[in-house]
């Protein structure tokens, strides 16, 4: 079983509630349709309801098993704002909650904060910086984590390591010029992530961007 088959099997065994705040993009809507058809998660699409239904029709996605969260539905916005206000440690005032709840990414992340969904998926249309800032604003860092980082899993033809052709690399996308403490945090978080996702027993090598000025820039 290859990596993606493993991940799909885990998802099917324990489907999570996933919010998609960019489903007004046809590519993302197609992803939502495929995930729903395969039973890999419960999909919540967040945005302008009329637009989302139009895109779904355009790409042939059946919305009967997908929850549409219409950020322009005034009654539902008010009901959601009241639920958010009632949650412990709500970080915003009433007016700000109602304003933010009308924005698809903000609404989706707010839903995650109060456990109406488990996960958010995005970044196709929004920038990495926007998604990270939104996550920090509404969700925050996991306990024990003090540095934001990313992890990529690479399938390298010809490589035969402890996990076959697969290697995890962190962090190649988010934290620029980390100090020693940040490097340590990234290494620990990367190891924990590959163990949680793939069940690997991680072995960590610390690789330098540049050796004695060989890669200036």
Segment roles from a protein language model:
Residues 1-217:
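Anion-binding alpha/beta catalytic cores of soluble intermediary-metabolism enzymes, centered on
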